[in-house]
Amino acid sequence: YKAGFEIDNNHETLLINYAGAFQIKGDFENSKKILKILHEKFPNNIIAHKMYSSVNNYNKNIEHQTVMQNKLKNEKLSYFDKATLCFALAKSYTDQKNHKESSNYFIKGNENMFKTYKNANINKQIELFQKIKSEFELYKFENKNQNDEPRLIFIVGLPRSGTTLTHQIISSHSKVYGAGELPVLKNAFLKNNQLELREDALIKNLNVGKFSSKILSKFMVYDKNSIILDKAPLNFMWIGHIHLLFPDAKIIHINRNIKDTALSIYKNMFDASALTWTYNQEHLIKFIELYKDLMKFWKLKLPNLIYECDYEKLVNDQENETKKLIKFCNLDWEDNCIDHTKNKTGIKTVSLAQARKPVYKSSVNLYETYVQYLPFLIFHYLVQTEKH
């Protein structure tokens, strides 16, 4: 991107990608410089405003907040562009601790995103979860010792549950390559990115040796000499397949206060069109129920396989909880794992700036700050629930 920028800094897509690359690497100041060039040359690029908002501190400068508010007045904007600006504005008001305005904007953002994906259907998700359970209902897994060093480690759970923090901690180990959120398993088990299992992923058709070798080769592309760490949270759907294909793989389930998780999901805009359930309150609640039910199923089928990592314990007692994580992964202790902020692994997450900071406790019980502004379905339902 740097070479292309030096040749021609008038290319819109190049500028977006260049700014994005800086953000992934944690170089937010250079990202902002590129995004300011984008704003000047391509003022109607709405994505650039969202990217800028993710790394800008609106306590210090509200000029860009005003620019976005003026952009939002354009009635010709698509639902997607309106949503993008609304989520960016929500973040700006969060910086200013104006939670009422922040709530107002991310509710509007979700409404516009749901209009963008007007064909979103939670019933497809329900059918997929039922199919996965039916595949493994009668299957009896072999008991195998997991004393060897794994080739693969998976961090699973709901989005916004703490998977990025855990990823940065474990990938600080010298033997681990933090690959971020990989699409490898999703692509292996679903038909053309649809919510339907591939025929060769069904147990009756599954050639374990051939299938595992094929998938492992896709992981090893990233670093064949290291343990590959995949933090795609929705891999919780594939725990049965993971253990069947890779019995030595380590699976870590991040367990966070469900009310905080639901809030964090609802107040953020995701890149993936596969996460359309996040933009509708009833769909979000239903997906959480599906997730909890499937995790309960896996724990019954594989009682000693999954490591339960409590997010609140991790942020309150980082050293002891980190040592437990490293021990579970059959790795020797390294002091690097305590200070994950020195980890230069690229990060793609909706909370880029937070992921580069030391462990912070401000996200614990965050839902309490928003309940008064969000007297809607999510909290009528979730306030009654326990963690899991």
Task: Give the label of every model feature segment.
Residues I242-K267, L325:
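Conserved phosphate-donor/acceptor-positioning beta-strand/loop module used by diverse small-molecule
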